[in-house]
Amino acid sequence: MSGFNKNQIYWGDYVGVIAAFVGVYTELVARIFIYMIPERVREWFRVRIIVLYHYYISSKTTDGMTDAVQKCRNIYEICEAFGYRVEEHLVRTQDNFILCLHRITHPKQSQHKREVVYCHHGLMTNSELWVAVNESERSLPFVLIESGYDVWLGNNRGNKYSRKHITYKPKDEEFWNFSLDDMAMFDIPDTVDYILRETGREKLNYIGFSQGTAQAMAALSINPDLNDKVNIFIGLAPAYAPKGFSNYFVDYIVKVNPKIMYHLFGRRCLLPSVTFWQNICYPPIFVKIVDVSLKILFNWDLSNISLNQKLCGYAHLYSFSSVKSVVHWLQIIKNCTFQLYDDDMALLAGYGSRHYQVPLFPTNNIKCPMLILWGGKDTLINMEVMRTALPPHAKEVSIAHYEHLDFLWGQDVKEEVFPVVIDALKHHSLGKAKHFVKQNGFH
């Protein structure tokens, strides 16, 4: 074993690596080329592309609110467009990241003595995800506020609103040395403690979307005291041990060797160039690009989300995260287990799993009430695996025709999701959990 190289890429990976490198560097060359074109020439092409798009592809027009939300630069402008205000709060984690919390308020309503709801977004997104809608009635935070709740939106380390550390700067590699482990050990518990101190409450209600579900489950599983601070945990479209990608080529590359991502993108921020393409692309064309990408990767049809909603939502969908956090998810996908980050993943190939075992998040240890809402067409959840890892008291509701993003932006989200969420919050905060479960027949 003296010649074993921990950072080695095996010969079977080379074809995939070369193809991936070609794709990455082709994008880089295209970006540099477009950037070098004079602004006046770029604008000339942009105008003609818009004309051709509306002539040959679509002549549909958008409504005023869609245009307004799409053009908003941040969550403050989005909420203002709907008549709400945003309080900004900063949380210093135990490992010295500065996280930004957004508390959504209504100017005509008091926050005093309201039940607290803490909502957390998914991977490579931010708090805007919850409010980037063209109708206020289809934003869960807005609906919760009107239902009498004190709503807080969290942000992961490294994203648009949380790019601050006491020691490191975003240009430093050390800044991006974080994975799901760090969010579970620090971000979620420290954010919960801050909200409870600020509001004077003993408990809050937690709602997570996608990775926001996974990282809170991880946090609850390794922080026993955290369970005593949560009335109910509600997971929307949980990302939990996904089976993989729908595209065979992509699935093969990431499953053969997740560390390929480090060779492609380094150990820093992942895909910051998305913001460049988003800025130069005509929004309906950007929507088409995102739709095609999600179809290729996850086989989502996205037919339950309107074009106007996509124009609003996709404009605020992407935010920064670390390459390491994505590598962590690729490890989870490869092993089909909800595990901690594997720092020595190459050892599995060198020594075999008989002598090396990555710790799993002990999610069976979660004590607080749990409700999982998942979609029958969501390829990012493996319910067979998830059920074996949930505690016996966890309840689930399935929506057969739902894909991943439908839980945020689906056209029928007001009828399919919001009533279940609000009923769960109401009954658990009133201590009527048993009646709630029996009445709704959860399975």
Swiss-Prot record:
Membrane topology: Single-pass type II membrane protein
4Fe-4S listed as a keyword: no
EC number(s) on file: 3.1.1.-
Record domain AB hydrolase-1: where: 116-410
Transmembrane portions of the chain: 17-37
Active site (catalytic residues): S210, D378, H404
Name used for this protein in its record: Probable lipase C16A3.12c
Organism: Schizosaccharomyces pombe (strain 972 / ATCC 24843) (Fission yeast)
Lineage per the UniProt record: Eukaryota, Fungi, Dikarya, Ascomycota, Taphrinomycotina
